[in-house]
């Protein structure tokens, strides 16, 4: 659930990606 991890790989933290502003970072990571 740590959004911080999603910076290195949002694929492993899809839940966080869909959960909060981290979603934006997830898309940027693509």
From Swiss-Prot:
GO terms for cellular component: extracellular region. SUPFAM superfamilies: omega toxin-like (SSF57059). One of its GO terms (molecular function) is potassium channel regulator activity. Expressed by the venom gland. It is found in: Secreted. Disulfide bonds join 3-17, 10-22, 16-26. Coiled coil: none annotated. Keywords: Amidation, Calcium channel impairing toxin, Disulfide bond, Ion channel impairing toxin, Knottin, Neurotoxin, Potassium channel impairing toxin, Secreted, Toxin, Voltage-gated potassium channel impairing toxin. InterPro entries: Huwentoxin-1. The keyword Membrane does not apply. The keyword Transport does not apply. Pfam families: Toxin_12 (PF07740). The modification Tryptophan amide is found at residue 30. Belongs to the neurotoxin 10 (Hwtx-1) family. 19 (HpTX2) subfamily. The presence of a 'disulfide through disulfide knot' structurally defines this protein as a knottin. Negative results: has no affinity for Kv1.4/KCNA4, Kv2.1/KCNB1, and Kv3.4/KCNC4. Inhibitor of voltage-gated potassium channels of the Kv4/KCND family. Inhibition of Kv4.3/KCND3 and Kv4.2/KCND2 is strongly voltage-dependent, while inhibition of Kv4.1/KCND1 shows less voltage-dependence. Its binding site may be near the potassium channel voltage sensor. Also blocks calcium channels. This is Kappa-sparatoxin-Hv1b.
């Amino acid at each position: 659930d740590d959004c911080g991890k999603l910076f290195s790989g949002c694929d492993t933290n899809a839940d966080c990606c869909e959960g909060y502003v981290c979603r934006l970072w997830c898309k940027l990571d693509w």
